Amino acid sequence: MAVQRTFSIIKPDAVAKNVIGKIVSRFETNGLKVVASKMKHLSRQEAEGFYAVHKDRPFFKDLVDFMVSGPVVLQVLEGEDAIAKNRTLMGATDPKKAEPGTIRADFAESIDANAVHGSDAPETAAVEIAYFFPASEVYAGR
């Protein structure tokens, strides 16, 4: 397995519940290192740009509305097989279908307010990381 970087968002619902530390602890306990992090209240333009791939989907407006409803925590995580590991830790998109002990099973309320976002592939991770973090803001995790 190779060391990878992945992008993570702790979404407004989880920030509002004050579970940021609990979520980050899950990442770190499972071998993922935080190599970049910032809290930000996304503008509508930032959220629309980030989720542009979903622009023509019926849920796009609700997704953008939710993502601008409060602050988020943007992070770059690094570790062995980081993308798959993060997706396993997050659990299924719908928290009702997420395995017990996953972030979404423990902290998410609904398929919309589902606590976290994580990249799904190396190419996606690279684009998502670059969207919010210039290279100078991402530090070597070794």
UniProtKB/Swiss-Prot annotation:
Catalyses which reaction(s): a 2'-deoxyribonucleoside 5'-diphosphate + ATP = a 2'-deoxyribonucleoside 5'-triphosphate + ADP; a ribonucleoside 5'-diphosphate + ATP = a ribonucleoside 5'-triphosphate + ADP
Uppermost EC category: transferase
Entry-linked SMART domains: NDK (SM00562)
Record keyword Transmembrane helix present: no
GO biological process: CTP biosynthetic process; GTP biosynthetic process; UTP biosynthetic process
Enzyme Commission code: 2.7.4.6
Subcellular location: Cytoplasm
Cofactor: Mg(2+)
Chief place where the protein resides: cytoplasm
One Gene Ontology cellular component annotation held by this UniProt entry: cytoplasm
Pfam family, one: NDK
Highest taxon in the source lineage: Bacteria
Active site: H117
Binding annotation for ATP: K11, F59, R87, T93, R104, N114
UniProt keyword terms in alphabetical order: ATP-binding, Cytoplasm, Kinase, Magnesium, Metal-binding, Nucleotide metabolism, Nucleotide-binding, Phosphoprotein, Transferase
Keyword Transmembrane helix attributed: no
Molecular function GO labels: ATP binding; metal ion binding; nucleoside diphosphate kinase activity
Self-association state and partner proteins as the record states: Homotetramer.
PANTHER family per UniProt: NUCLEOSIDE DIPHOSPHATE KINASE, NUCLEOSIDE DIPHOSPHATE KINASE DDB_G0292928-RELATED
Function field: Major role in the synthesis of nucleoside triphosphates other than ATP. The ATP gamma phosphate is transferred to the NDP beta phosphate via a ping-pong mechanism, using a phosphorylated active-site intermediate.
Family listed: Belongs to the NDK family.
This protein's name: Nucleoside diphosphate kinase
Organism of this sequence: Thiobacillus denitrificans (strain ATCC 25259 / T1)
Gene name in the database record: ndk
